[in-house]
Amino acid sequence: MSEIKVGENESLDNAIKRFKRQCARSGVLSEYRKREHYEKPSVKKKKKSEAAKRKKRNF
């Protein structure tokens, strides 16, 4: 869980921006989206191989 301590002279908007940035860096939202629905192991394997193909093609 991401935790932000708001400084004395820091505005709430800045604290929210820092929190969102920290969540994005730690991958909380992407992990949530990935686990939102059950994914069969065969589908996971297929997605992983397709991602590897895309990555190889881009290099």
Swiss-Prot record:
Basic residues bias: start-end ranges: 43-59
Signal peptide segment: none
Record-annotated membrane-spanning stretches: none
Highest taxon listed in the record's lineage: Bacteria
One term under GO cellular component: ribonucleoprotein complex
Region spans: Disordered: 35-59
InterPro entries the record matches: Ribosomal_bS21, Ribosomal_bS21_CS, Ribosomal_bS21_sf
NCBIfam families reported for this sequence: S21p (TIGR00030)
Identification of the protein by name: Small ribosomal subunit protein bS21
Native source organism of the sequence: Finegoldia magna (strain ATCC 29328 / DSM 20472 / WAL 2508)
The gene coding this protein: rpsU
